Design a protein with these regions (language model features):
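An alpha-helical, amphipathic repeat domain used for nucleic-acid recognition
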Residues: 1-159
Length: 159
């Protein structure tokens, strides 16, 4: 029950090609191979070989993706966790990469997101909803909105 368009392309070759483009979790790689109609046994064998040669490593892939999102300063910790969970990484593994003192970073990121989206303080509720949709906690949201309003007031005074 192989793919009809290229019968000699094995699950291992397909998985290797997928991993060459981007690291995937084991769960996501299994899904992608299943969608391509490879038999379960062939998928299991391919995954086993990829793990053996360390081409497939959930911890490495999760850490790399976490760092990329964390360093970009565009995502809340909750949003990073949700994206990684959706990508097939286990919650325990995701939590392993969370720094313990991320609140200061969260406030800084929320403030920068507000500055990028809003050029002047508009409706406070709209700003709060925007940050809430990004996954920020209420205390971070209120603090960032207050800081944004003060920053905008100071900019207006200087003009």
């Amino acid at each position: 029950m192989r793919r009809q368009n290229n019968p000699e392309r094995t699950a291992l070759i397909c998985a290797t090609d997928l991993l060459a483009r981007q690291d995937h979790s084991e769960v996501r790689l299994r899904q992608k191979l299943a969608v391509r109609k490879y038999p379960k046994e062939e998928i299991d064998d391919a995954i086993e070989k990829l793990k053996k040669y360390n081409y497939l490593n959930d911890e490495r892939a999760c850490g790399y993706q976490f760092d990329m999102m964390y360093q970009s300063n565009r995502y809340s910790m909750r949003q990073i966790s949700a994206k990684l969970f959706t990508a097939g990484f286990k919650e325990e593994l995701i939590n392993k990469f969370k720094p313990e003192d991320y609140e200061e970073r969260e406030e800084r990121v929320a403030f920068h997101l507000l500055k990028a989206k809003y050029k002047n303080p508009t409706d406070i509720r709209k700003m709060q909803q925007f940050l809430y949709a990004k996954g920020f906690e209420y205390s971070i949201i209120t603090s960032a909105v207050e800081k944004f309003q003060l920053d905008m007031e100071n900019d207006n005074i200087e003009r």
